[in-house]
Amino acid sequence: MQVSGIKNNISFKSAQLNIVSTADNHGDILSMPQMMKAIQMNKRDLFEKASEKSTLNLFAIAGDFFMNPSKKGFLTNPEFSNGDIQYNFLTKMVYTAKTAAGIKNRFDAVYTPGNHCFDGGDEWLFKKFERAPISTILTNIDRTHSPLADTLIRENSNIGTYKVYDIPDSKNPDKINKVMVLGVTIPSMNYYNPGLLKKTKFYDNSNKNDAYLEERDLRKTVRVVRYNVSKFKEKNPDGVVIVMAHTGNKISGLLAEKIPEINLIINGHDHKEFEVLKGSTLILSHGQGNKFMRGIQIKFDDKGKLSEIRARKYETEKYEPIARKDARLQEFVNVNIKADLVPLVYFKDNSGKAEELVLDDSIRYSNNILANYITSAIKRSVRLKYPEIDAVGIPSTIFRNGLKSNEKRSTFNNIDLMKMFDGVSENLSQVRIGRINGAELFELVLENVQNNLKSRTRNALIQWSDIQINRSLVKEINKGNSAASYKDAIKIRDKATRKFAPIDPNKDYTILMSDKYLLKDSENIKIPAMIRDKFEVIPESYDSL
């Protein structure tokens, strides 16, 4: 358990705010019970002095609780989508936190959306939260160009651009301590979810990956946060400002730098696990997949000034076996996904290595056995309808979850299978078929590899069914350490001979690719835009194939 925080030299505390915070849960319902159990078993520390009138208790989610909400495929409740089941687990988690704080004590749950929360579009998300037991905060939304959100904000008290809480002093009933909570969503929706936000626009919306966003790209975002903070501080100079930022640490750091009146930023999006003090602003990041949560205590002194911010990190994995033994919790799990937990896939050890699948001539390169296996399976499936296909390309980010055997797990269930393509929303898993010449195909593959070498985590490598890439050789050529040419590092399987050979620049090839990759416009991705018109949408998705 890690402890971090800010403390002023004042000992007496007259009001307190307890926060349990999380982010980037990514719809991982299998690990949510362990977080619920962690909340239950640490409730006295998490919700310190919860019953006092001078204490407020919050449960905060800094984005991406959901992922691919429109996807279906459950066995227990086939009529339900991912989002329906994830929402059930959300309400259960909120109720767990509320009961841990004390059912009669002051409590609220606050949430700001992340990019994955919009995987099913804006209408799906806002319809769910219109009557949800949680306050949704949308500080950087452009209400003028967001008719759906604007209407909901005007008509629903639980949806707004900020929320202010009153915490009474423990001794002086006339003194009220103020806390404002804001929520900032990563604005690059044209990058993460192009075309899915029909009636919603965030300030500074762009098609840039957040790694490439600079201060000049976020001026309106900073301005709207500063405006709200300034108005609050004018009336409440001693008030505390908290920002739930699903932006990543780079942008959270920018907000802290430009708006030093912010006391605490609950950061999500970049899946980091660190705490950093930027000026007088404490930034707490939250990892992903329910691996840990944070317990935060904010205390006011006798004069109503901020006295202390203390944060602890609670790992949740050790509570997994305890959660499985909780009859009530397991009853809830079974109602939602019992049939989906039955083992469907088994790893068989044929080579002395439990994680290694039996290889055949469909496997090209040992960089990702699972990706190679799946791209080949998709290729075989699509060739039943489109026999002219030469190769299938899938960005590796789509394989957000793999099937990895270890000493703890060698069997996998329907939930595991459904999550294999969780790196892209159902709407954007559409595929396109195009016929391009060899020179264009070679440049497409090489550009992707070069961008991946610049940043492996930001620029996804495309996994191919019948194209062999020697990424290491490309790297050595770049350094001048090899006399080979790039053509030696990129080869395609010849349909007739089944052998790999250099891509022929004078030959045409038929390729199946991700709709999302072809639509993506980025400063570091050029070729897809040049060949996009040669691709046609087909009525298939990666899941259906």
In which residue ranges do the predicted regions lie?
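Acidic, metal/ion-coordinating pockets
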Residues: 7-318
